[in-house]
Amino acid sequence: VAEARQICPACYRLIPADAHVCPACGADLDALSARDYRVKLLAALHHPLDDVRMRAILALGLRGEPETAEALADCALRHPVDVVEGLAVVDALSHLGRAGARALARLAENHPARGVRDAAQLMTLRLRGDANAAPDQAPPA
Protein backbone atom coordinates (compact mmCIF):
# COMPACT_ATOMS: atom_id res chain seq x y z
CA VAL A 1 0.00 0.00 0.00
CA ALA A 2 1.40 3.37 -1.04
CA GLU A 3 1.98 6.00 1.62
CA ALA A 4 -0.38 9.02 1.43
CA ARG A 5 1.45 12.10 0.12
CA GLN A 6 0.90 15.83 -0.21
CA ILE A 7 2.70 18.61 -2.04
CA CYS A 8 4.55 21.19 0.02
CA PRO A 9 3.08 24.63 -0.81
CA ALA A 10 6.51 26.23 -0.29
CA CYS A 11 8.85 24.03 -2.35
CA TYR A 12 6.32 21.91 -4.30
CA ARG A 13 8.01 18.63 -3.36
CA LEU A 14 6.05 15.47 -2.62
CA ILE A 15 6.07 14.81 1.14
CA PRO A 16 4.22 12.56 3.62
CA ALA A 17 0.56 13.54 4.07
CA ASP A 18 0.87 13.65 7.86
CA ALA A 19 3.85 16.05 7.88
CA HIS A 20 3.47 19.35 9.74
CA VAL A 21 6.92 20.54 8.69
CA CYS A 22 8.26 19.94 5.19
CA PRO A 23 11.23 17.56 5.43
CA ALA A 24 12.67 19.05 2.23
CA CYS A 25 12.57 22.80 2.94
CA GLY A 26 11.54 23.09 6.60
CA ALA A 27 8.36 25.06 5.89
CA ASP A 28 5.72 25.12 8.64
CA LEU A 29 2.79 23.55 6.77
CA ASP A 30 0.22 24.54 9.39
CA ALA A 31 1.26 28.20 9.15
CA LEU A 32 1.19 28.08 5.35
CA SER A 33 -2.29 26.59 5.43
CA ALA A 34 -3.53 29.37 7.72
CA ARG A 35 -2.41 32.18 5.36
CA ASP A 36 -4.85 34.69 3.90
CA TYR A 37 -6.41 33.56 0.61
CA ARG A 38 -4.85 36.47 -1.34
CA VAL A 39 -1.42 35.44 -0.05
CA LYS A 40 -2.06 31.87 -1.19
CA LEU A 41 -3.11 33.08 -4.64
CA LEU A 42 0.01 35.23 -4.95
CA ALA A 43 2.15 32.23 -3.96
CA ALA A 44 0.38 30.14 -6.61
CA LEU A 45 1.73 32.51 -9.28
CA HIS A 46 5.11 30.82 -8.64
CA HIS A 47 3.76 27.27 -8.94
CA PRO A 48 5.54 25.06 -11.52
CA LEU A 49 2.23 23.85 -13.02
CA ASP A 50 0.70 26.26 -15.52
CA ASP A 51 -2.90 25.29 -14.71
CA VAL A 52 -2.35 26.20 -11.05
CA ARG A 53 -0.91 29.58 -12.08
CA MET A 54 -3.84 30.12 -14.46
CA ARG A 55 -6.42 29.55 -11.73
CA ALA A 56 -4.59 32.05 -9.52
CA ILE A 57 -4.46 34.62 -12.34
CA LEU A 58 -8.19 34.30 -12.98
CA ALA A 59 -9.05 34.50 -9.28
CA LEU A 60 -6.83 37.53 -8.70
CA GLY A 61 -8.44 39.32 -11.64
CA LEU A 62 -11.90 38.59 -10.29
CA ARG A 63 -10.95 39.78 -6.80
CA GLY A 64 -9.85 43.14 -8.27
CA GLU A 65 -7.16 43.98 -5.69
CA PRO A 66 -4.81 46.60 -7.20
CA GLU A 67 -1.90 45.59 -4.92
CA THR A 68 -1.62 42.31 -6.87
CA ALA A 69 -0.90 44.00 -10.23
CA GLU A 70 2.90 43.84 -10.13
CA ALA A 71 2.89 40.19 -9.04
CA LEU A 72 0.63 39.34 -11.99
CA ALA A 73 2.88 41.18 -14.45
CA ASP A 74 5.95 39.48 -12.96
CA CYS A 75 4.25 36.10 -13.48
CA ALA A 76 3.67 36.86 -17.16
CA LEU A 77 7.29 37.93 -17.58
CA ARG A 78 8.59 34.78 -15.82
CA HIS A 79 6.73 32.59 -18.34
CA PRO A 80 7.24 34.40 -21.66
CA VAL A 81 6.42 31.43 -23.91
CA ASP A 82 3.02 30.86 -22.29
CA VAL A 83 1.05 33.34 -24.38
CA VAL A 84 -2.34 32.12 -23.12
CA GLU A 85 -1.23 32.81 -19.57
CA GLY A 86 0.12 36.20 -20.62
CA LEU A 87 -3.21 37.12 -22.21
CA ALA A 88 -5.04 36.04 -19.04
CA VAL A 89 -2.75 38.34 -17.06
CA VAL A 90 -3.59 41.21 -19.43
CA ASP A 91 -7.29 40.61 -18.81
CA ALA A 92 -6.79 40.35 -15.03
CA LEU A 93 -4.80 43.60 -14.99
CA SER A 94 -7.62 45.40 -16.80
CA HIS A 95 -9.69 45.03 -13.60
CA LEU A 96 -7.09 46.50 -11.25
CA GLY A 97 -7.37 50.25 -11.80
CA ARG A 98 -4.29 52.47 -12.01
CA ALA A 99 -1.97 49.80 -10.64
CA GLY A 100 -3.21 47.45 -13.36
CA ALA A 101 -2.69 50.13 -16.00
CA ARG A 102 0.92 50.64 -14.87
CA ALA A 103 1.55 46.89 -15.01
CA LEU A 104 -0.08 46.72 -18.46
CA ALA A 105 2.28 49.45 -19.69
CA ARG A 106 5.23 47.41 -18.40
CA LEU A 107 4.01 44.32 -20.27
CA ALA A 108 3.37 46.37 -23.41
CA GLU A 109 7.02 47.40 -23.40
CA ASN A 110 8.80 44.38 -21.97
CA HIS A 111 6.97 41.12 -22.64
CA PRO A 112 8.93 38.96 -25.12
CA ALA A 113 5.79 37.64 -26.87
CA ARG A 114 4.43 40.07 -29.43
CA GLY A 115 0.86 38.88 -28.89
CA VAL A 116 1.02 39.72 -25.20
CA ARG A 117 2.74 43.07 -25.86
CA ASP A 118 0.09 43.99 -28.44
CA ALA A 119 -2.79 42.91 -26.18
CA ALA A 120 -1.36 44.91 -23.27
CA GLN A 121 -0.95 47.97 -25.47
CA LEU A 122 -4.49 47.65 -26.83
CA MET A 123 -5.92 47.20 -23.34
CA THR A 124 -3.99 50.25 -22.12
CA LEU A 125 -5.50 52.33 -24.92
CA ARG A 126 -8.99 51.03 -24.20
CA LEU A 127 -8.70 51.78 -20.50
CA ARG A 128 -7.73 55.35 -21.41
CA GLY A 129 -10.81 55.58 -23.60
CA ASP A 130 -8.83 56.05 -26.82
CA ALA A 131 -11.33 56.18 -29.69
CA ASN A 132 -8.66 54.88 -32.08
CA ALA A 133 -8.01 51.69 -30.08
CA ALA A 134 -8.92 49.30 -32.90
CA PRO A 135 -12.64 48.90 -32.08
CA ASP A 136 -13.01 45.99 -34.51
CA GLN A 137 -10.69 43.81 -32.43
CA ALA A 138 -11.99 41.95 -29.41
CA PRO A 139 -10.14 42.51 -26.14
CA PRO A 140 -7.97 39.61 -24.99
CA ALA A 141 -9.76 36.86 -23.12
Residue ranges, per PLM feature:
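Cys/His-rich microdomains that often coordinate metals
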Residues: 15, 29
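Flanking scaffold residues of small Cys/His-coordinated metal-binding clusters
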Residues: 2-3, 17
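Amphipathic alpha-helical scaffolding segments comprising HEAT/armadillo-like alpha-solenoid repeats
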Residues: 3-7, 23, 32-44, 65-78, ...
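Residue-level signature of the C-terminal ends
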Residues: 28, 60-63, 93-99, 126-130
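Short inter-helical turns and helix N-cap capping residues of alpha-solenoid HEAT/ARM repeat scaffolds
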Residues: 48-49, 79-82, 112-115
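Residue-level signature of alpha-solenoid helical repeat scaffolds
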Residues: 58, 74, 91, 106, ...
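Residue-level detector of extended alpha-helical repeat arrays and alpha-solenoid scaffolds
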Residues: 53, 69, 82-86, 117
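Cys/His-coordinated zinc-binding microdomains
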Residues: 12, 26
